[in-house]
């Protein structure tokens, strides 16, 4: 699959991730693996993570920040908000087999204020949070 098609599939995935789990999960192979290293969770088989996402107890919003990759490995940087709360930063590392995702690792974190002691080395432009 060409890079433009993969990018379009990833955009579609996040556009529907908060509203339609059937469409959002079209991107995965049936035997796909989803991991959250921060919580130590691993889900094997798309049906397992699609089902808990259907009943997720918070209203989610996603904002795509950047998608980059080539070949079978892609990285997506997103922002996510739970129930209209503060935005968290996410990084997803996605491995493709053919035209579908076979493995995804998601890292989620909150932004933090830059420490003053690093200021003299820091570029003065601001990275969007």
Predicted regions and their residues:
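Alpha-helix C-capping/helix-to-loop hinge sites
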Residues: 13, 34-35, 77
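A beta-strand edge to alpha-helix "cap/lid" segment located at domain peripheries
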Residues: 1-2, 50-129
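A solvent-exposed, acidic/Ser-Thr-rich amphipathic alpha-helical stretch
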Residues: 4-8, 21-72
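Short, low-complexity N-terminal intrinsically disordered segments enriched in polar/charged residues
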Residues: 1-26, 30, 121-129
């Amino acid at each position: 699959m060409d890079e433009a098609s993969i990018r379009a599939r990833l955009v579609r995935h996040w556009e529907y991730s908060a509203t339609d789990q059937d469409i959002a999960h079209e991107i995965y192979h049936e035997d796909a693996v989803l991991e959250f290293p921060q919580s130590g969770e691993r889900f094997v088989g798309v049906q397992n993570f699609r089902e808990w996402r259907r009943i997720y107890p918070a209203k989610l919003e996603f904002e795509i920040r950047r998608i980059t990759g080539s070949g079978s490995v892609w990285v997506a940087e997103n922002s996510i908000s739970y129930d209209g709360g503060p935005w968290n930063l996410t990084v997803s590392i996605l491995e493709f087999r053919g035209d579908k995702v076979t493995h995804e690792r998601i890292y989620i974190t909150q932004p933090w204020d830059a420490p003053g002691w690093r200021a003299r080395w820091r570029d003065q432009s601001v990275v969007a949070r």
